[in-house]
């Protein structure tokens, strides 16, 4: 599957430019109001379960939607997903001038494994 290999390379390259944060640290920053968590999964994935207090902006539209929903380029934005999309989204936001962007390591699976809350 060469397409998957190229995708994995793209994700690996993005991760070199993006700071990763643990689910526990992401939860603490969300709960303190220090950060916004952005779920970059598609709406149908979001509807199946998501992090309470997170904002949904799919990977396909985040560049169009981000300024309307998070205008401050200095705000801490933590992207998460179910795979590598959060690293790609975080890198894209950095290129748009957002200065405090993170990708949550392990995505929603790691969040659930840490027994952090989800809702649907």
Predicted segments with their positions:
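N-terminal glycine-rich beta->alpha transition that marks the start or flank
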Residues: 39
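Rhodanese-like catalytic fold shared by cysteine-dependent sulfurtransferases
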Residues: 1-35, 43-78, 84-120
């Amino acid at each position: 599957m060469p397409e998957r290999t190229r995708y994995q390379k793209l994700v690996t390259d993005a991760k070199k430019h993006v700071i990763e944060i643990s689910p526990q640290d992401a939860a603490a920053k969300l709960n303190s109001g220090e950060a916004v968590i952005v779920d970059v999964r598609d709406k149908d994935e979001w509807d199946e379960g998501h992090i309470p207090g997170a904002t949904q902006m799919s990977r396909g539209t985040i560049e169009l939607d981000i300024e309307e929903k998070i205008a401050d380029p200095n705000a801490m934005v933590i992207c998460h997903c179910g795979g590598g999309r959060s690293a790609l989204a975080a890198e894209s936001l950095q290129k748009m001038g957002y200065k405090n962007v993170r990708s949550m390591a392990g995505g929603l699976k790691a969040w659930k494994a840490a027994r952090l809350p989800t809702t649907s």
